[in-house]
Structure formats: C-alpha cells, structure tokens
Amino acid sequence: MKKGIHPDYHPVVFQDSATGFKFLSGSTVGSAETIKWEDGNEYPLIRVEITSDSHPFYTGRQKFQQADGTVAKFNKKYGLA
C-alpha cells in the first residue's frame, strides 16, 4: 500500500443520542470531543442519532403492515367486495 494516501483509522466511541448506548469501534471519523472508556483510555466521541440500540428493526418494535393485493384494492375501490 502507498504511504500517505489512506485516511487515519483509529478507535472511536459512538454514542446513541436517543438511548445513551455507547460502543467502541474503529473509524476514520474524528472528533474534538473525547470520552473515557471502560479500559481507562480516552477516545474521540461521535454522537449518532440511530444505532442498533434504538432502531425499530433491531429492537423488535417495528410494525409490519399487510399490503392489500391488486385485486383486493380494485374490489374495495369499486365496492365489489
């Protein structure tokens, strides 16, 4: 790999703004804000709006809607049902 052309990849802490859930991961994103992690080291803190802790798909709070079929829509529209 060529030197000097790749972004700096380092550990950062992501925090869910809605739930406060935090996790440590690697990223090229930087931040002036830092936080002390469980291992005693300080890492840049990145605040995000949605993580797996608050997204409805991962939390099981997602609502599934049954879509009507084309024939059912036609019958409903013209009162044939």
Swiss-Prot record:
Example of a GO MF term: structural constituent of ribosome
GO cellular component labels: ribonucleoprotein complex; ribosome
Keywords: Ribonucleoprotein, Ribosomal protein
InterPro entries: Ribosomal_bL28/bL31-like_sf, Ribosomal_bL31, Ribosomal_bL31_B, Ribosomal_bL31_sf
GO annotation (BP), single: translation
Coiled coil spans: none
Record's keyword annotation contains Ribosomal protein: yes
SUPFAM superfamilies found in the cross-reference section: L28p-like
Record note on quaternary structure: Part of the 50S ribosomal subunit.
Family per record: Belongs to the bacterial ribosomal protein bL31 family. Type B subfamily.
Family annotation (NCBIfam families): L31, PRK01678.1
Protein name: Large ribosomal subunit protein bL31B
Organism: Pediococcus pentosaceus (strain ATCC 25745 / CCUG 21536 / LMG 10740 / 183-1w)
Encoding gene, per UniProt annotation: rpmE2
